[in-house]
Protein backbone atom coordinates (compact mmCIF):
# COMPACT_ATOMS: atom_id res chain seq x y z
CA UNK A 1 0.00 0.00 0.00
CA UNK A 2 1.30 3.43 -0.92
CA UNK A 3 0.49 6.37 1.34
CA UNK A 4 0.03 9.97 0.27
CA UNK A 5 2.54 12.52 1.58
CA UNK A 6 -0.17 15.24 1.61
CA UNK A 7 -0.65 16.92 4.98
CA UNK A 8 -2.19 19.97 6.64
CA UNK A 9 -0.14 21.90 9.20
CA UNK A 10 -1.64 24.67 11.33
CA UNK A 11 0.47 26.78 13.68
CA UNK A 12 -1.16 29.19 16.10
CA UNK A 13 0.04 31.79 18.59
CA UNK A 14 -2.51 32.73 21.26
CA UNK A 15 -2.09 35.88 23.36
CA UNK A 16 -4.12 37.10 26.30
CA UNK A 17 -5.06 33.68 27.66
CA UNK A 18 -5.89 33.29 31.36
CA UNK A 19 -2.83 32.29 33.43
CA UNK A 20 -4.62 29.51 35.31
CA UNK A 21 -5.68 27.75 32.10
CA UNK A 22 -2.16 27.82 30.68
CA UNK A 23 -0.57 26.46 33.84
CA UNK A 24 -2.96 23.50 34.28
CA UNK A 25 -1.38 20.46 32.64
CA UNK A 26 -4.32 18.11 33.26
CA UNK A 27 -6.84 20.62 31.88
CA UNK A 28 -4.74 21.08 28.73
CA UNK A 29 -4.16 17.35 28.27
CA UNK A 30 -7.89 16.63 28.51
CA UNK A 31 -8.80 19.32 26.00
CA UNK A 32 -6.05 18.47 23.50
CA UNK A 33 -7.12 14.82 23.48
CA UNK A 34 -10.75 15.90 23.09
CA UNK A 35 -9.80 18.25 20.24
CA UNK A 36 -7.92 15.44 18.49
CA UNK A 37 -10.92 13.14 18.86
CA UNK A 38 -13.29 15.78 17.44
CA UNK A 39 -11.01 16.25 14.41
CA UNK A 40 -11.23 12.55 13.58
CA UNK A 41 -7.65 11.78 14.59
CA UNK A 42 -6.55 8.64 16.42
CA UNK A 43 -4.63 9.32 19.65
CA UNK A 44 -1.69 6.96 20.20
CA UNK A 45 0.00 8.52 23.22
CA UNK A 46 0.29 11.69 25.30
CA UNK A 47 3.54 13.11 26.63
CA UNK A 48 3.48 16.07 29.00
CA UNK A 49 5.78 18.19 31.12
CA UNK A 50 5.22 20.87 33.76
CA UNK A 51 7.93 23.51 33.99
CA UNK A 52 8.98 25.51 37.04
CA UNK A 53 7.91 28.01 38.04
CA UNK A 54 5.29 28.08 35.25
CA UNK A 55 4.45 26.53 31.92
CA UNK A 56 3.32 23.31 30.36
CA UNK A 57 4.03 21.29 27.24
CA UNK A 58 1.54 18.68 26.07
CA UNK A 59 2.24 16.56 23.00
CA UNK A 60 -0.51 14.33 21.64
CA UNK A 61 0.95 11.72 19.30
CA UNK A 62 -1.57 10.87 16.61
CA UNK A 63 -1.68 8.02 14.15
CA UNK A 64 -1.92 10.87 11.63
CA UNK A 65 0.95 12.93 13.19
CA UNK A 66 0.69 15.31 16.21
CA UNK A 67 -1.05 18.06 18.18
CA UNK A 68 0.93 20.08 20.72
CA UNK A 69 0.78 23.10 23.00
CA UNK A 70 3.60 24.98 24.73
CA UNK A 71 2.55 27.59 27.29
CA UNK A 72 4.07 30.65 28.91
CA UNK A 73 1.41 31.51 31.52
CA UNK A 74 3.34 34.47 32.92
CA UNK A 75 3.08 36.05 29.46
CA UNK A 76 -0.47 34.78 28.81
CA UNK A 77 0.87 33.04 25.68
CA UNK A 78 0.40 29.62 24.09
CA UNK A 79 1.90 28.13 20.92
CA UNK A 80 -0.17 25.39 19.29
CA UNK A 81 0.91 23.10 16.47
CA UNK A 82 -1.28 20.58 14.63
CA UNK A 83 -0.01 18.53 11.70
CA UNK A 84 -2.08 15.78 10.13
CA UNK A 85 -1.14 13.49 7.25
CA UNK A 86 -3.63 12.49 4.59
CA UNK A 87 -7.15 13.75 4.02
CA UNK A 88 -9.23 11.95 6.65
CA UNK A 89 -8.52 14.32 9.57
CA UNK A 90 -9.34 18.03 9.71
CA UNK A 91 -6.83 19.85 11.97
CA UNK A 92 -8.85 23.09 11.86
CA UNK A 93 -11.54 21.37 13.94
CA UNK A 94 -8.97 20.64 16.67
CA UNK A 95 -7.63 24.20 16.55
CA UNK A 96 -11.12 25.73 16.70
CA UNK A 97 -11.98 23.59 19.72
CA UNK A 98 -8.83 24.62 21.63
CA UNK A 99 -9.25 28.32 20.78
CA UNK A 100 -12.86 28.18 21.99
CA UNK A 101 -11.69 26.67 25.31
CA UNK A 102 -8.77 29.08 25.87
CA UNK A 103 -10.55 32.25 24.68
CA UNK A 104 -7.48 34.32 23.70
CA UNK A 105 -7.64 38.09 23.34
CA UNK A 106 -5.80 37.76 20.03
CA UNK A 107 -4.55 35.03 17.75
CA UNK A 108 -2.09 34.64 14.87
CA UNK A 109 -2.49 31.60 12.62
CA UNK A 110 -0.72 30.08 9.61
CA UNK A 111 -2.13 27.20 7.60
CA UNK A 112 0.27 25.18 5.47
CA UNK A 113 -0.16 22.41 2.93
CA UNK A 114 2.78 20.00 2.99
CA UNK A 115 3.94 16.95 1.10
CA UNK A 116 3.04 18.16 -2.39
CA UNK A 117 6.46 19.57 -3.32
CA UNK A 118 6.84 23.13 -2.11
CA UNK A 119 5.23 24.01 1.22
CA UNK A 120 2.15 26.06 0.32
CA UNK A 121 0.49 28.64 2.54
CA UNK A 122 -3.23 27.89 2.63
CA UNK A 123 -4.31 31.28 4.07
Swiss-Prot record:
One of its GO terms (cellular component) is cytosol. The active site is at 65 (schiff-base intermediate with substrate), 70 (proton acceptor), 85 (proton donor). Binds 1 pyruvoyl group covalently per subunit. Belongs to the prokaryotic AdoMetDC family. Type 1 subfamily. It catalyses: S-adenosyl-L-methionine + H(+) = S-adenosyl 3-(methylsulfanyl)propylamine + CO2. This is S-adenosylmethionine decarboxylase proenzyme 2. The modification Pyruvic acid (Ser) is found at residue 65. The record marks 64-65 as: Cleavage (non-hydrolytic). Keywords: Autocatalytic cleavage, Decarboxylase, Lyase, Polyamine biosynthesis, Pyruvate, S-adenosyl-L-methionine, Schiff base, Spermidine biosynthesis, Zymogen. PANTHER family: S-ADENOSYLMETHIONINE DECARBOXYLASE PROENZYME. Its cofactor is pyruvate. Catalyzes the decarboxylation of S-adenosylmethionine to S-adenosylmethioninamine (dcAdoMet), the propylamine donor required for the synthesis of the polyamines spermine and spermidine from the diamine putrescine. Pfam families: AdoMet_dc (PF02675). Heterotetramer of two alpha and two beta chains arranged as a dimer of alpha/beta heterodimers. Its EC number is 4.1.1.50. GO terms for biological process: spermidine biosynthetic process. SUPFAM superfamilies: S-adenosylmethionine decarboxylase (SSF56276). The keyword Ligase does not apply. It comes from the Bacteria. Pathway: Amine and polyamine biosynthesis; S-adenosylmethioninamine biosynthesis; S-adenosylmethioninamine from S-adenosyl-L-methionine: step 1/1. GO terms for molecular function: adenosylmethionine decarboxylase activity. Is synthesized initially as an inactive proenzyme. Formation of the active enzyme involves a self-maturation process in which the active site pyruvoyl group is generated from an internal serine residue via an autocatalytic post-translational modification. Two non-identical subunits are generated from the proenzyme in this reaction, and the pyruvate is formed at the N-terminus of the alpha chain, which is derived from the carboxyl end of the proenzyme.
Amino acid sequence: MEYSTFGKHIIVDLWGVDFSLLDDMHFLEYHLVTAADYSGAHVLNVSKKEFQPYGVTVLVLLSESHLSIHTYPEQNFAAIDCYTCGTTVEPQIAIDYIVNILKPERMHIKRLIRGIGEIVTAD
